[in-house]
């Protein structure tokens, strides 16, 4: 492409401006498991629905997770229609069917498996990170009103399988080595069972990854205003580590395969402004979030574009960005 090159005219047609490039999924995602690793999120949500018992007894013993749907995981920029489903208002005697009215985002980390394991062969906690290829940013969209009606007794179904969005970049665990951090557990909490415990995990099991959510409404776009930040948190505040997720997932002999993906669960910090969902920021819809342009939100509206990003940064190490993950909500048909 040097000026005057004989091949310049031919090669110039191969160049595409970055703004015009369309990303594809970084791999074919196999099985998908979503965890629930933020104790701050679990406690905050629990207080809204079970004020006398916000954190269930198993939370501090087990890395809670459930199997999700990989077919609806899309790349950043994949807009989606507002989902429909059954909901039941608190005062209603019967459920009704229609578009979700309490659509929410969830700020998560996506974890990609590199090398799998054979069926019946658990992965030990000290070997767990050898099976992790890398990490991305993940938005696990949630239909809260559909979820509230359907989730008993087996957990979420239609409230989660309509759309999930990942960033186009997978940052390898090798690149993240300078940002590994100490993992601790409160002395008053139950200490991990032996298969979830190791000196290595205590020393460097966490990842220091800053996470941020921004919102761009249709009105903001019309006025050519930039998106507004909603919250910022950090993955190092997670109650369970990546290695513990892998070790727990396979301790019964479950086999993982290359391209499998874990979701970390919503990553909220200890402070209210570090909430990783609208459910928390709006106190389950009872306290509208005020935006700089005068708009308010309790949950997401049609035309809203949710943007998430993540980065690692500290003195003495190269800054690492995870790119953006964003998608716009289209009206239900």
Task: Label the model's feature ranges.
Residues 239-248, 257-258, 262-311, 316-325:
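Active-site pocket scaffolds in enzymes
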Residues 329-331:
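Interdomain boundary/hinge segments at the C-termini of tandem beta-sandwich modules
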Residues 1-232, 239-243, 248:
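Active-site microenvironments in enzyme catalytic cores
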Residues 31-38, 255-265:
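Conserved phosphate/anionic-ligand binding catalytic regions in large, soluble enzymes, centered on
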């Amino acid at each position: 492409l040097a000026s005057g090159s004989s091949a310049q005219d031919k090669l110039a047609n191969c160049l595409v401006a970055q703004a015009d490039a369309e990303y594809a999924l970084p791999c074919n995602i196999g099985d998908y498991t979503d965890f629930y690793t933020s104790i701050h999120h679990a406690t905050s949500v629990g207080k809204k629905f079970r004020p006398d018992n916000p954190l269930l007894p198993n939370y501090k013993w087990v890395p809670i997770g459930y199997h999700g749907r990989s077919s609806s995981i899309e790349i950043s920029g994949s807009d989606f229609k507002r989902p429909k489903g059954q909901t039941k208002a608190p005062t209603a005697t019967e459920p009704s069917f229609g578009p979700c009215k309490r659509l929410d985002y969830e700020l998560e980390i996506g974890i990609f498996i590199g090398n799998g394991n054979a069926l019946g062969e658990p992965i030990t906690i000290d070997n767990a990170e050898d099976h992790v290829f890398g990490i991305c940013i993940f938005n696990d969209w949630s239909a809260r009103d559909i979820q509230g009606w359907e989730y008993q007794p087996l957990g979420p179904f239609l409230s989660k399988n309509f759309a999930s969005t990942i960033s186009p970049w997978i940052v390898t665990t090798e690149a993240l080595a300078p940002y590994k951090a100490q993992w601790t557990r409160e002395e008053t909490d139950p200490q991990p069972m032996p298969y979830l415990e190791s000196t290595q995990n205590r020393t460097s099991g966490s990842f220091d990854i800053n996470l941020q959510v921004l919102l761009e409404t249709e009105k903001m776009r019309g006025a050519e205003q930039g998106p507004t930040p909603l919250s910022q948190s950090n993955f190092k505040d997670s109650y369970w580590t990546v290695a513990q997720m892998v070790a727990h997932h396979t301790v019964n002999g479950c086999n993982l395969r290359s391209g499998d993906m874990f979701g970390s669960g919503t990553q909220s910090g200890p402070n209210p402004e570090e909430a990783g969902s609208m459910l928390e920021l709006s106190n389950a819809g009872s306290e509208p979030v005020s935006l700089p342009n005068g708009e308010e939100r309790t949950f997401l509206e049609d035309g809203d574009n949710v943007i998430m990003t993540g980065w690692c940064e500290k003195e003495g190490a190269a800054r690492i960005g995870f790119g953006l993950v964003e998608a716009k909500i289209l009206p239900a048909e």
